[in-house]
Amino acid sequence: MTPCDPVRVARPSDKLARLMALERAVVATRNEHKLRELREILTGVELLPLPADVELPREDAETFAENALDKARAAHAATGLAAIADDSGIVASALGGRPGPRSARYAGPDATDEENLNLLLSELADKDDRSVAYVAALAYVDADGNEKLVEGRCEGTLAEQPRGTGGFGYDPAFVPADTGPDDDRTMAELDPDEKHAISHRGRAARRLAEVLVSKR
């Protein structure tokens, strides 16, 4: 695998804030970690939590993109607001792309992050190829129902043991390629700004900003 493209734009916040100044956006997730990260990346944009009475569709599509679009459409339909939805996960080359869109429930429907990570670690324990990638699909539906979809990707390898206390999901074992060949820190060992500069979710947010700017 090749590393992700170098990061040329540090943050999309100012552009996105100007574009969305007249409308708030609800984030179609119940995952507090995702909501927090999107708020850290898209500073200056008013991102609202999903109302408690809004039901999201099951994430049972075959691709990250389909899941993200389904959630953004549902949140927009229920609230009438612009909506942003993220669907993301990890793909392992040696496992044919698994866990993929099932990343959040890889070890079972109610599995914890630790259980999911431990299962992946056990499946790669005897594999020579430990290359993995984080993939994020970010869907945006504006207040008029117009849709945009972007994806971000970050290549890396899976460490043999978890390290670090930051992040969530598979971060404690994900060693990103973009920090350099002599840096073996996991995503969970990076500070938030370092992580967002190279992460799949950060890249997707920057691409969304560029797409929206180009359409105006």
Indicate where each model-derived feature is located.
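Anionic-ligand binding patches
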Residues: 12-26, 33-216
